[in-house]
Every structure is written in structure tokens, then in C-alpha cells.
Regions:
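Secreted/periplasmic proteins
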Residues: 1-99
Length: 99
């Protein structure tokens, strides 16, 4: 695996947080292509892939979290829809930092 890649459990958050401020001061939009990560700098672009179905999406880090072990990312509801794991709630995802 490349040094800019990671694999781990991802979750999603959405409608209940709509309009609330994210850690970087933006208002959360559940449909936006954004994600929370515990350490990556804000505005970092990350390709998140679901190896179960081959889908991937590029997301922008604008929030902090998740705060539940062993999760490594929390994606927006819209991103989870595109990745195909809304019903499951969790997925073992691959993350690739693009810049």
C-alpha cells in the first residue's frame, strides 16, 4: 500500500447535522462531497473507495472525527449514498490522499 493510503472502517453522518458548523467553520451539508478525518488538514482531497462494490468518490476534509474506534473516516450522507453503504452504516473503505 502506498504511504498516502489507508484502509479501515468508515461511517457516515447526515441529516441530523445539517446546518451545524463543521470543525473548519463551514455549515454541514449532508449532500456535499465532504468528510471528517481525525488528523488530515482541512481541504485535503481524499479518494474514498468501497472495495465491496468498486465505487469511489473524491471528498474534501472539512470536519474532525470520527471519535469511535476503530473508524478512520466519517463521510457525508451523500457520499455514503454514492459509495453504496447507507443501509449498512459502516464499510471497510480504502482512503487515498490526493492532496
Amino acid at each position: 500500500r502506498a504511504p498516502n493510503a489507508a484502509e479501515g472502517v468508515a461511517s457516515w453522518y447526515g441529516p441530523g447535522f445539517a446546518g451545524r458548523l463543521t470543525a473548519n467553520g463551514e455549515r454541514f451539508d449532508p449532500a456535499a462531497p465532504t468528510m471528517a478525518h481525525p488528523r488530515l488538514p482541512f481541504d485535503t482531497l481524499v479518494r474514498v473507495s468501497n472495495p465491496e462494490n468498486g465505487r469511489s468518490i473524491v471528498l474534501r476534509v472539512n470536519d474532525r472525527g470520527p471519535y469511535v474506534e476503530p473508524r478512520i473516516a466519517d463521510v457525508s450522507y451523500g457520499a455514503a449514498q454514492q459509495l453504496g453503504f447507507v443501509q449498512n452504516g459502516l464499510v471497510v473503505a480504502e482512503l487515498e490522499v490526493l492532496g
